Structure formats: structure tokens, C-alpha cells
Amino acid sequence: FLGDAPTGVLLGGPRAVRSDEWGTLTPLCFRQQYNTLGAYNRYSQTIGLVRTDNMLVYGQPAWDILTLFRPFYWGYLFFGSERGLSWFWCARLLVLFLSWFELGMLISDGQKKLSVMLGICVSWAPFIQWWFAINGLVEMLIYGAFFVLGTNYLVSHAFNPRKIAVAVGMAVCAVGYVLTFYPTWMVPVAWGFVPLFLWVVIWKFDRKVLRRVDVVPWLLIFVITAAGLTVLALTSWDVIKAELNSVYPGNAPSSSGGTGLWWMMKYPISLVSRFSMNELIVENSSIICFAPAGFILALWVIIKEKKKDPLLILLLGINLFLAWYYCVGIPKWLAKMLLLSFVNSNRGPQVLGFLRLTLFVRAVALKEKAPKRWLAALAAVISSAVPMRLALGFTKYEPGGLRYEYFDTAEKFVVVWAILAVVFYLLYRARKSKYTMAVLGVCTVVLASSIWINPVAKGVPEITKSETMQQIRDLVKEDPQAIWLVVDM
């Protein structure tokens, strides 16, 4: 961070490329403890002399009623910056895995192995790990998953005191989702949860146990959510208008049509990113979703096994619609009506890997028959060639024309293709309650592609114990009213 103290890293290595984490978000959160307007004040002029609102853009911990809807910032308020940073990282990873494990239990009808696989595929996806602390993506996935799970509980259980607690939690999720305030990811992530929400509300609704009193939790959700959003609008309206009228992300170029297919199917790049550490690997990371295996498995279940499963059909439908939107396009008026006009050509396809994961988990959970070995092998080789071809042709250009090739040798290409073909084969041969090898293969590929990304560190000695920081402390003691000008740091 400052370069003159131990980093405290126990495993892995610091990621200088993630400057919007260590150079922006973390310093902004740490400054709150030393806010000149009061520790963890909602407003600050500690960095810069202009009084700024800390709630939305790069939202920071603050003693404010809206922080009730940001539980992952509570560690800063109660334990200070160093332990607060640990709470922020560790709690989010743990809760992300648990929320998607529980969502997997719902999607797979209680099959634990598939649920563990889904939790690992989401929480340890390379794309999630590279963007773990920035722009609220992890929170979006957590809040969306818990909202679906909460809805399932409310529509399938008789009224009891737990429903009130669930309703409060769902309201926290709803307002917390809005507080992430990054439209170019908020919109596609929300659309990814739509089929799950519809399935729960329509097909899991149990009229036998529900009574009029069961409307109370929904009213509570509405009241708390409305109150939270009203407070946000009244106190941050200028920030909201400025964000929505910004060049990015407020007015991001629409992704209707264009290069969506490349962004949706380039996940093989993440399997070799360990050996290609250029500054664009973060932008080009993916959720390893093993597409198009999910589509093929879904069609097998629907056509070959003649199962008209509502959730599988909903997931397949929204996948195809969003693929059409990104690759072909829809009219501008429809894109605006569906809020998809906020989504640009790379951010949207990047996050929808989790939607394709839910598709293939549901398909494997329902699949009872397996194709013959030779047919599964042939299908695996051919279908895995699709993402490999797209990844091979995916090239990122900078304004200066600098070109990056991720599969710069034939060996890399062949090895990754072979790995994907094996996993695809295991998925095609998998069937209900007989998919252990497929689960192990999927988890191994995902973890090998991502577990090295974020280092494990103890404390933040590079900030708190560096010579530079000690000199700054001494100077501040000499002249607490000094105005600082920092150059080339």
C-alpha cells in the first residue's frame, strides 16, 4: 500500500491491479474513523475539502439509520477499521456461500451435494473474487438469494413469530440491494432472480396453510422498505441525480446487441488467468458456468425425459431472452421499460453466469436418465468447443491498440479444452442422486481458477505500522490544523 512496511500477507500475494479496492474503497472506509466531522459521520471532508455524502457512491460505514441495511459495515462501527475490514471480507464470503447453498437446496429439492457445488461456484467464481469488494456485487447476490428464500418461507408456512423476523430480514435485503447503487449490475442481477421469485410465488404457494393474518409480514416488508427508500431519497437526492446522469455507470452505453456472445462465453479465459496477469484480467474474468452444458441438460430433461418443470422452463426462458438481448438486441423503448438500458455490453453478460449455474443445477437435479457413453463423450467434445472458440477469439483492445492473447500457446488451449470436455462429459452422464464425480469436477475447476486470487492477510500493518504513517502522525500532532497536499503518492 505504502511500500515501506510488511504486508501481513500469510498466503497469496497482494493484487496491485485492484487499485479501486486498496486505493479507493478501503482508504475511504478507513478515513471514517478519523473523520474531522466526527468518527463515522455520514458526511466527510477529510479527503478533499468539500463536504461529501458517504452513503451511496463507494458507500462507507457511518452512524446513520440507513446503515441498518448494511450489516457488513457494522464491523467498522463496533470494532474499528482493522477488524472492520476483516468483518467486511470474511462475513461476506461466508454469508455468500451459505445463502447460495440454501438457494441450491431450494432449487435442487434438497440435494446437498448440488447445493454445495452451487455455493462454491458462486462464492469462488473468478469474477466474484476479482470484484469481491467493489460496487456491491456480493451484496446483490446475497440479498437477492435471501429475498427469494424469505419469500419461499412466507408463502409455504403457516403464520408464526418467525415470519416477522423473516419479513424484517427481507426488508433489509430490499433496501440494502438499492444501496449498492450500481445500476449496470443491479439490473441484470435482479433479472436473474426473477424466474426464481416467480416460481416460488406461483408454484410454491400453499393455500392450505395461509390465512389472512399472513398478509402482515408483507405489509411489514412494504412499510420498512418504503421508509428506508424515503429516507434515502430525502437525504441523498442530489447524489442519486448526479449518479444517474453520469456518463458511467448512470448512462452506460446500452448492451442491446453487439458483442454479448463473446462476454457470455469467454469463461475459459479464467482457467488460464493465473498465467496471464495483465491489468485487464479483472475486466475479462468470468463466472465459470459451464455453458452451454446447462442449456443442453435442460433441453434433455424437457424433451427427452418429457418433464415440463416450471422452474426449468422459466430459467431457460430468461436465459434465452437475455442472450437475445445481448447478442441481437431489442427496441430501445422495451429496453428502457425493462431497465436494461442501464446495462452495458460487458457488465451485464458477466454477472449472468450465476443464472446459467442455477439452470444446470436444476437440470441435473431433475435428470433421471443418461445418454450412452459414446454420445455423452461426443456431445462433451463438441459443446465444450463452443466456449473454447469464443475464448480463443476474445481479444481486448486499449485505445493505444495494445492486444492481449490469453491462449498464446497451443498447449494452453488443448489442456483447457480437455478439462472442460471431461467436466462436460461428467455432467452429461450425471443423473439424479448419481452425480458425485460431476460435482467434484466442477468444484475442482472453479476453485483452481479462483482460490489464489485474493491473498489471506493478518491485520493491515502496511497502513498502521509503516514509517510513512508514523511520520504523518508526528506531523499532525505538531500542527493538527494543517491542510495537507499529497503529490505522487
Regions found by a protein language model. Name each.
Residues 96-104, 144-155, 194-199, 203, ...:
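Transmembrane alpha-helical segments
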Residues 1-53, 213-271, 483-485:
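Aromatic-rich transmembrane-lumenal/periplasmic boundary elements in polytopic membrane proteins
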Residues 97-106, 112-205, 214-237, 383-390, ...:
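Membrane-embedded helix bundles of polyisoprenyl
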Residues 372-488:
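Transmembrane helical bundles and short interhelical boundary loops of multi-pass, membrane-embedded
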Residues 83, 87, 127-139, 320-375, ...:
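Membrane-helix boundary/interfacial segments in multi-pass membrane proteins
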Residues 161-165, 205-223, 307-311, 369-378, ...:
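Membrane-interfacial entry segments at the cytosolic side of transmembrane helices
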Residues 21-63, 70-73, 79, 435-489:
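Soluble catalytic regions of membrane-associated enzymes that act on cell-envelope
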Residues 230-311, 346, 350:
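Periplasmic/ER-lumenal interhelical loops and adjacent helix-loop junctions
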